[in-house]
């Protein structure tokens, strides 16, 4: 292989590695966002259940 061909292969490998790491990073962001939303919902329900007026208005949340 010539020097130019080796350099081209090197650039393709670097590009492929960057694309794979970028997409896996974005996927983990989505999972983290879903976990944070779930935690926020649980915190809101817990806060509602600790206050009697909210608990009486939403008994399905605090059963």
UniProtKB/Swiss-Prot annotation:
InterPro entries: Conotoxin_a-typ, Conotoxin_a-typ_CS
Pfam families: Toxin_8
Post-translational modification: Is not hydroxylated.
Signal peptide range in chain numbering: 1-21
TM stretches of this protein: none
Residue span(s) of the pro-peptide: 22-46
Keywords: Acetylcholine receptor inhibiting toxin, Disulfide bond, Neurotoxin, Postsynaptic neurotoxin, Secreted, Signal, Toxin
GO CC annotation terms, alphabetical: extracellular region; host cell postsynaptic membrane
Residues covered by region (Ser-Xaa-Pro motif, crucial for potent interaction with nAChR): 50-52
GO molecular-function terms, A-Z: acetylcholine receptor inhibitor activity; toxin activity
Tissue expression notes: Expressed by the venom duct.
Record localization: Secreted
Function: Alpha-conotoxins act on postsynaptic membranes, they bind to the nicotinic acetylcholine receptors (nAChR) and thus inhibit them.
UniProt comment concerning the protein's domains: The cysteine framework is I (CC-C-C). Alpha4/7 pattern.
Family, as annotated: Belongs to the conotoxin A superfamily.
This protein's name: Alpha-conotoxin-like Am1.6
Species the sequence originates in: Conus amadis (Amadis cone)
Lineage: Eukaryota, Metazoa, Spiralia, Lophotrochozoa, Mollusca
């Amino acid at each position: 292989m010539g020097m130019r061909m080796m350099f081209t292969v090197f650039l393709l490998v670097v590009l492929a590695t960057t694309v794979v790491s970028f997409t896996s990073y974005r996927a983990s962001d989505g999972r983290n966002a879903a976990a944070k939303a779930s935690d926020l919902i649980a915190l809101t329900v817990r806060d509602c259940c600790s206050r009697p007026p909210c608990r009486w208005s939403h008994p399905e949340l605090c059963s």
